[in-house]
Amino acid sequence: MTEIHPDDLILVAVMTDPRDLEIARVLGWYRIPVAFAPKTLRVDWIAFYLTSAFGDEKWSIRYLARVKGHELVRRRELLRDEPDHLRANEPYFKVQLGPLVQLTKPIPSRRWRRFTFLYTTGERLVRAHEIRDLRVPPSRTRDLLLRERGTKA
């Protein structure tokens, strides 16, 4: 597994459809609607929190990928087989990914949690026994985001 450094900034994103995991694995990208995007996509890694659509893997983080960059595109450019989708013309971030990596130890949620994105660090991800262990204090999250944007905290 590619080494995760303690200070790496990791975006945890909710993945609701097994098709999206296959796209990440085979095509090397993940989509995020601009209207719901997190504060920054300038992160080192993206980890995927799997919902109930993933059966036995539900409510856990099992996969992550190094983020190589991102670009702005229309949904119809990403999913060409859905030209008539209601959001076909809406802007999305296409996050380019390195190879999908499976965690040696999944990070479960002891109970159902509702969130879209959260930021954590490499240190917290490696040490986590449960999703709540990923939480970074708000002041530390602010410092990490400012660092990624090239601003002093």
List where the protein language model places each region.
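Structured alpha/beta reader/binder surfaces that contact nucleic acids or chromatin modification marks
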Residues: 2-153
